[in-house]
A protein has these predicted regions:
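C-terminal substrate-binding/catalytic lobe of Rossmann-fold NAD(P)-dependent oxidoreductases
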Residues: 1-81
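NAD(P)-dependent Rossmann-like dehydrogenase/reductase catalytic/cofactor-binding core
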Residues: 64-105
């Protein structure tokens, strides 16, 4: 597994570039389908957002999700998968703190 986070040239927008080696071979459609499924239900609902719309760093500023999965950038080659997730490193973090406080109170 390998990854990098890059702060984009805007005040708060960033992107994560994550590369993983999986036990089984997958294709782009399988990866994107799984991320879409997880984003719409379960523990990551409201935290992970799935999109197939083209994004730029300024689209992320003010976004409350911890990660916006950019399906247009997904790559798969056998066991290797590369995915990208955009996030507003200030606002998304603040929203998760509010979530935590709501659980504690």
């Amino acid at each position: 597994m390998d990854g990098i986070s890059i702060r984009a040239p805007v005040a708060d927008g960033s992107i994560v570039d994550l590369v993983v080696h999986l036990a089984s071979e997958v294709d782009v459609d399988q990866v994107n389908s799984k991320f879409a499924e997880v984003a719409d239900s379960g523990a990551l609902e409201g935290i992970l957002r799935y999109t197939d719309e083209p994004l730029v760093s300024t689209d992320i500023v003010g976004n409350p999700y911890s990660c916006t999965f950019d399906s247009d950038l997904t790559m798969a080659n056998g066991h290797e998968v590369k995915v990208f997730g955009w996030y507003d490193n200030e606002w998304g973090y603040s929203c998760r703190l509010v979530d935590l406080l709501q659980r504690l109170l």
